[in-house]
A protein has these predicted regions:
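Bacterial N-terminal signal peptides that target proteins for export
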Residues: 11-29
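Short acidic/polar inter-strand loop motif in beta-rich domains
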Residues: 124-132, 263-268
């Protein structure tokens, strides 16, 4: 997405003989170092890529976190310093996604009952300082027109310090699809919610998706959908006044839908802007 940023691998921490508190401190330092270096932890999309989208009841599913672009991503190992929420919700309710610190997959879940599972990961905010060229380019590419216009009105032409959070979800189906089961809100700051169960759909049908910010519909946001088999052939739409977009999905396979929203950072945040990156994956 941003050609000026260097892609590097996330450091492997799982072999270090550290206590839990030492791991958290080191993890936070590593995350900050990666963010400040402009590595893909910030620069690209983040999504959930389960080891299977169609597990059997009782099966254990690995919940892999990926950071990259166009379905080419580096692993994001489990880091407790980053996790705000890491959950799965099914017909029996919500429970945490467990895992081992430093491991990839970052989480493991056992399918307790057949049906649709909604898996979600919400990160804590991380900070980054961006040059004017890099910040302006990414604001343009992510369709953040309101931010660009506000900076122009204020005569802000320099770089910017930003805090960013990831809000990723994935839909996994165990057993036969059921029209009465669907995606649901997990209460993430920025969230994509499929208003139709994609596992009940066929090729060429419309998938309505709603985008919310702080549990309210977000209008005018750029929403992008891509298929893993041909990620360069993207579908794009702007959310309407109800936060809704509709995508006619032209092929089977794994889909990723994403959106970014940016606001002015709260006082005391030691940053000018706060961004939220939402994603939703499923298989058609």
């Amino acid at each position: 997405m941003l050609a000026s940023l260097t892609i590097t691998k996330t450091p492997k921490l799982m072999s270090l003989p550290l206590s839990s508190s030492m791991f958290r401190r080191l993890g936070a330092l590593v995350v900050a170092a990666i963010a400040l270096s402009g590595a893909p932890l910030f620069a690209h999309d983040m999504w959930i890529e389960p080891t299977t989208f169609s597990p059997k009841p009782g099966e254990i599913v690995g919940v892999r976190l990926r950071v990259g672009q166009d379905f080419l991503g580096d692993p994001l190992p489990r880091n407790p310093a980053l996790i705000n929420q890491f959950v799965v919700e099914d017909a029996e309710g919500r429970r945490p996604v467990v895992g081992r610190n430093g491991a990839d997959p970052a989480g493991l879940l056992r399918v307790a009952v057949p049906g649709l599972l909604v898996v979600g990961y919400h990160s804590n905010p991380s900070a980054i300082e961006l040059s004017a060229e890099t910040f302006n380019q990414y604001v343009k590419e992510e369709g953040l027109d309101a931010v660009a216009a506000l900076r122009a009105r204020r005569g802000q032409t320099g770089g910017a310090r930003e805090i960013f959070s990831r809000c990723a979800k994935s839909l996994v189906l165990s057993g036969s699809p059921n029209r009465t089961q669907g995606d649901r809100s997990l209460g993430f700051t920025l969230e994509l919610v499929a208003e139709r169960n994609p596992y009940t759909m066929g090729v060429g049908q419309n998938l309505p998706v709603r985008l919310t910010y702080e549990s309210r519909p977000l209008a005018g946001a750029l929403v992008v959908a891509m298929n893993r088999s041909n990620p360069s052939d993207k579908l794009t739409a702007r959310s309407d006044k109800d936060g809704r977009v509709r995508f006619r999905l032209p092929r089977t396979g794994v889909w990723l839908i994403k959106a970014v929203h940016m606001v002015e950072a709260a006082p005391g945040a030691n940053a000018a802007w706060a961004s939220y990156w939402a994603s939703l994956t499923f298989e058609l």
